[in-house]
Amino acid sequence: MKSWIREKKYECGEYRTVGIYAVTDQEHRQRGRKQKESSRGQKARNKNASMRRYQRKVLANFDKDGFYVTGTYEDAYRPESFEDCMQDVRNYVRRVKAAVIRRFGEQRARQLKLSLHAVRNGEKGKLHMHGFAECKGLTAAERREFRQMLEELWRRRVPGAGEYEPLGTCNADRIDMKKILGIDGDGKNGTVGYIYGHSERRCVETRNLTLPEELRAADTKWSRRQLRQGCSEHAEDAAWWEQRFPGWEVVQVMVYDPQQLYETEKPRPEGWESTDPQAYLILRRREFAKVRT
């Protein structure tokens, strides 16, 4: 059976992510209809793949001028169901859009990007909100005003009155890119990993989010020996990896156990491609300020 090393890349604004792993020719054949539920290990891999996709979307749309938003509830206003919390998040998005239009105008409102999750841990966990917000093109003073707006609009209308009352506490903190990239020393998956750590989560987003661009895969760039070297003796050698990607600097190198980063649902025959490690890199264009591990 033919097998080779694949390099798969995504452009995410000033960042690029790269996955390097072994594939076989059978994995290019058309996938049939799913016949049985995925194994626990496959579900974990699917979750991690979804987390990486979301991290790429965050990198493509939000930067240090944006905000990481957390909204919690006072006990009196805690939703009875997850769907009620989702409705609160939808209402919050609608209020933020309307407030940005009123204050900054429709032109600026077109640059408003929101990606907010209703989350909880288990059926008995407390419902709350996490996510990202940014309005491009604002001055420093306008960003401070936008931040205050984000914190004050986590509220609801008082029935029978033209007044509002807060649902609880809402904090809008400046985005720390080291936390987004997972290089702040608090877990390699960073803020996105924290959001995905909740057992139940659902996202509400504005429609103007930029999707990361998937680049053409390279199937002849890497040998098995080179991948093994990169994942072992050069795993923490940024200079070695940067020689492989001119014009980019390494932000993070993650080495995964065999089949952990990429795995087909069909079992692989015994062979080197099922036992070799896999690598996932986050790179940053050199013209931007350095973010080192």
Describe these PLM feature segments.
Residues 1-127, 135-293:
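Right-hand nucleic-acid polymerase module
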